[in-house]
Amino acid sequence: MVKIRLNRMGRRHQPFYRIVIVDSRNKRSGKYIESIGYYDPLNNSNQYKVDEDKALDWLLKGAQPTDTARRILRKMGVMKRYDEIKFQARKEKGVKESNEIVEPEGEEVKE
């Protein structure tokens, strides 16, 4: 399973995180597929930056964000766009299914 999670960087007592796409079986700071942003918790404004298009693309491919990554993506507005796209897809799928004509099974009744 592919995850969106934080990869710890920086020195001791001064953490800095990259937001990365990684196979869930890899180590916390192991090899990652792609880096899509960063998060600096020590900055007074909790500075973060995410490439929204890449994050949305990976979410649509099925990547699962961790809790902290999901919180950052929600602040950036990525999760809202993702939810809207998924809702629209479900809505269109429901319309297609309701437009199909279902013929009743069984024999016709003759009078």
From Swiss-Prot:
GO terms for cellular component: cytoplasm; small ribosomal subunit. The keyword Transport does not apply. Pfam families: Ribosomal_S16. InterPro entries: Ribosomal_bS16, Ribosomal_bS16_dom_sf. Residues 100-111 have a biased composition (Acidic residues). The keyword GTP-binding does not apply. Transmembrane segments: none annotated. It comes from the Bacteria. Residues 92-111 are annotated as: Disordered. One of its GO terms (molecular function) is structural constituent of ribosome. PANTHER family: 30S RIBOSOMAL PROTEIN S16 (PTHR12919), SMALL RIBOSOMAL SUBUNIT PROTEIN BS16M (PTHR12919:SF20). HAMAP family: Ribosomal_bS16. This is Small ribosomal subunit protein bS16. It comes from Petrotoga mobilis (strain DSM 10674 / SJ95).
